[in-house]
């Protein structure tokens, strides 16, 4: 049991250390209740608000909703210093 726990802990530590400095994990299809938090506390927040066939149709950048202006893969990237 202890060996399994240590193995899982090692895998988690490996994933965290392979992350780029200053980058948090991307989140696909963010929930609406996270929007206010991310846009308040992150210097740069980009949301895919309406994901259609893997593409972002409506995008929110900073605090302004831009409809049908950007089309890119549906992910949310939270960069600390960009």
From Swiss-Prot:
Glycosylation: residue positions: 62
Keywords assigned: Early protein, Glycoprotein, Signal
Matches recorded under Pfam families: v110
Domain of life: Viruses
Leader peptide range in chain numbering: 1-28
Induction section of the entry: Expressed in the early phase of the viral replicative cycle.
Role this protein plays: Plays a role in virus cell tropism, and may be required for efficient virus replication in macrophages.
Family label: Belongs to the asfivirus MGF 110 family.
Protein's name in the database: Protein MGF 110-5L
The species this protein was found in: African swine fever virus (strain Badajoz 1971 Vero-adapted)
């Amino acid at each position: 049991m202890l060996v399994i726990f240590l193995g899982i802990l090692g895998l988690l530590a490996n994933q965290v250390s392979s992350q780029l400095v200053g980058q948090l994990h991307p989140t696909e299809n963010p929930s609406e209740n996270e929007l206010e938090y991310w846009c308040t506390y992150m210097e740069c927040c980009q949301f895919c608000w309406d994901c259609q066939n893997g593409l972002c149709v409506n995008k929110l950048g900073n605090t302004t909703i831009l409809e049908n202006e950007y089309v890119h893969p549906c992910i949310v990237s939270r960069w600390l210093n960009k």
